[in-house]
Amino acid sequence: MLTPPRTVVRRDGGLYALERALQRRGFRHVAGADEAGRGACAGPLVAAAAVLPEGRRGEIDGLADSKLLTPASRERVYAEVVARALAYAVVVIPAAEVDLRGLHVCNLAAMRRALASLATAPEYVLTDGFGVDGLDVPGLAVWKGDRVAACVAAASVLAKVTRDRIMVELDTTFPGYGFAEHKGYITAEHSAALRERGPCPEHRFSYVNVATVSGRRGAPPRARRPLVVGLDEPMERSGAVEGTVGVALGERPWAAVSVGNDVAMEGGM
């Protein structure tokens, strides 16, 4: 295994500086991983990983942290990442799985599965914010990594666009909550709809605001969801909504499945 680099890279060196430094040290395939939906109280948690080509082939015009891009810009950059990445993978974790296993456990498992699903095996991994254990290659957790590493920014766009598309679908299936607008995050409109309608199956009952309106605030976090499936039972059997990982490739959407038995959307050059 190659020795991790000791090169000092300035945070203001540009979006590609960190990957270029790693590649100069011999790590040709640098993967970035990020997620979308941690702070939402409804909808899935989505993790993505991406490996961009070396040099100018890996430079994508307008690439940035997905949160800094307009919806139209995200869609354009998403298409560029899908077309030009050496490899990419997206994993979708349903809200019920987040309730059963816990947010951080699902976050780590989803990022780990996305990285393991890459068609091009990474030689070094960059993650946004916190490290991911259980990898066979060296890695680095980078604070605000989606703003300083191109591969992490690419992963953030993949995760964000995939999740936003799912929330638009859920808005049709569960009208009245405004999912297409706020994407499952807490807003005044969302809170008012929760109080008026109560939660739907796509809400995260382990979150205090959802548990409160459902009348289950006093129950332990993992016991708040009314219908609990077994940990080893695929989530498609629990009535989870279809419309997750395959849609971005123009394929028929697949049902969301559990961390232990998930299906990743894979692709690349």
UniProtKB/Swiss-Prot annotation:
UniProt-annotated binding residues for a divalent metal cation: D34, E35, D128
Record EC number: 3.1.26.4
UniProt domain RNase H type-2: residue ranges: 28-222
Gene Ontology terms: cellular component: cytoplasm; ribonuclease H2 complex
Substrates-to-products reaction catalysed: Endonucleolytic cleavage to 5'-phosphomonoester
Cell compartment(s), UniProt: Cytoplasm
One record GO biological process: DNA replication, removal of RNA primer
Protein name: Ribonuclease HII
Record has Cell inner membrane as a keyword: no
Domain of life per record: Bacteria
Membership in a protein family: Belongs to the RNase HII family.
Gene: rnhB
Source species of the chain: Salinispora arenicola (strain CNS-205)
EC top class, as a word: hydrolase
CDD domains: RNase_HII_bacteria_HII_like (cd07182)
Keyword Manganese applies: yes
NCBIfam families for the chain: PRK00015.1-3, PRK00015.2-2
One Gene Ontology MF term: RNA binding
